[in-house]
């Protein structure tokens, strides 16, 4: 009689008095006509699987109506019933298995179907094989940052004891310059990831907006989903990984690859901010990239100086999938009132757009001009080369380059507060102004024998 009383005290008679079972532990209880149910509880500290196995002795058979409960709003709710090894309604061996168990306390009611005797209840918890993501991260405000080249792990689809299922995780990336981004998410166990629900977002006007969803072999879901974009500009982007069904862990890989060509000096989207374009060297720039706040760079402006009347030539070539506009890419002059006027468009083999555009003109007067490089479609880098009239370094105008030209240039620089810019060939280094750099360039010409 004493043993029976101690057993009843150990097994609990309601969810409020349920006996705690630890992972890996087995508890013993007794059921008969007077004691038809026994209550236990488990505390789950992370996402994973729960296995419960009850085995009876004597004439006792256990009901498959034995149930696992969660607790929400101060009341229990069913998380599922046990199943029998052979019997539909009762058995001497019943079990419960769940793979989507989240954190919290759960309550277990073992119910008698018939007979009397003792039983054992064994509890086993197996954590999700992949580590958890840093919760909370269920919105963009609480997103954690990803680093290029790194893989993070997370979990989705697990349901807490108070009935909350983790259906999405948010991350963010900071893109420092124009380039490509790539994501790959791979799920484990029975977790399926949503293709339409997994999305990359930009941020404008204090709100997120879609920059595109992931894709997979399945239309709506897959265990492997990917996202790629080649036109990504600077800024912070947000990534939502969304569950379609099931539960388990996932691995998320992120990589950023910068545009292989150097960026042009922004801002240079109008003639007032035009960058300097010297004769000879090739400039690199980028077009077609869309920033996180939804601004696409569609044109770049440069300023160049023709220091003596003669021929000029331009070549611009796009890379990756960037195509350049023939009608938008043009040469401009500057009116006396400070506005530009159109001179001529570039040309290419196609009517509207080309990868390579060119412009040539003869007998161009001295002065400052502007060139606008305009995108037609795509994104990528470009190479721009300008070749102006040949600068001989004949500063004194005697028909040859000698030490007297060096002396003349130094005298002009030191002896005048306003050295003449009208002297042909004085701007030897081609930077649009006469400085000590031109003296150095002129000496280089003499030393080279040219």
Predicted regions and their residues:
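Predominantly extracellular/luminal regions of secreted and cell-surface proteins
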Residues: 9-23, 126-151, 257-282
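Short clusters of hydrophobic/aromatic residues that line enzyme substrate/ligand-binding pockets
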Residues: 21, 27, 31, 146, ...
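Sec-dependent, cleavable N-terminal signal peptides
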Residues: 1-11
